[in-house]
Regions:
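Exposed, interaction-prone extracellular/peripheral surfaces
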Residues: 2-183
């Protein structure tokens, strides 16, 4: 996901569009206001490189806060696994739309997360809080895959209804394939 964000920042600044960056978990960790100068590119890329992924998040609350703090209309891009309350995330994204922003979601999905393609017991470790859970994937695979498809379809449908672009990104795809899905 960091490479995707870096590529998007690069493309925006090379087109002389302003690009900024906000990283967050339970709170906003970093905000760099948008600028279109080429010199701004290094600052954004360094900040993206140094940002930490993981930790618990409260996406929906932070989306509302950000929507209120960004006064100039523009393009808002959310790169996330979207593992939070789906309805609250959509409400937060609609807040941006209400303020006149265009919104794109890049939903980051690992193929094994999508298919639960494991043969035996799996020990899951939550990257946000290190909780552990061991399960036999064969016992839950069918129900899990159905639930995951419903989860993704919820976002696709709600985004379509609210004029929000939704792009599912496979973590095993190369950067050019990921970008071509949207561009």
């Amino acid at each position: 996901s960091k490479n995707l964000v870096a590529a998007l920042i690069y493309l925006m600044i090379k087109q002389q569009d302003a690009a900024g960056l906000t990283t967050f978990d339970e709170k906003i960790n970093l905000t760099i206001p948008p600028k279109s100068k080429t010199s701004h590119l290094n600052l954004l890329l360094k900040a993206m490189h140094n940002s930490k992924i993981g930790g618990e998040t409260d996406i929906s609350t932070l989306l509302h806060s950000l929507a209120e703090s960004i006064h100039k209309r523009g393009l808002v891009i959310l790169v996330s696994d979207l593992l939070d309350d789906e309805e609250k995330i959509i409400k937060g994204l609609r807040h941006f739309r209400h303020k006149g922003h265009e919104v794109i979601i890049f939903h980051i999905v690992d193929p094994k997360e999508k298919s639960l393609d494991f043969d035996n017991n799996i020990n899951f470790i939550d990257i946000e809080n290190n909780d552990e859970l061991t399960i036999d994937s064969r016992q839950i695979k069918k129900d899990y895959v159905k639930a995951f498809d419903q989860f993704c379809n919820y976002y696709k449908n709600k985004c379509l209804k609210n004029n929000i672009d939704y792009v599912q990104i496979d973590t095993t795809d190369s950067l050019d394939i990921s970008l071509m899905q949207y561009l």
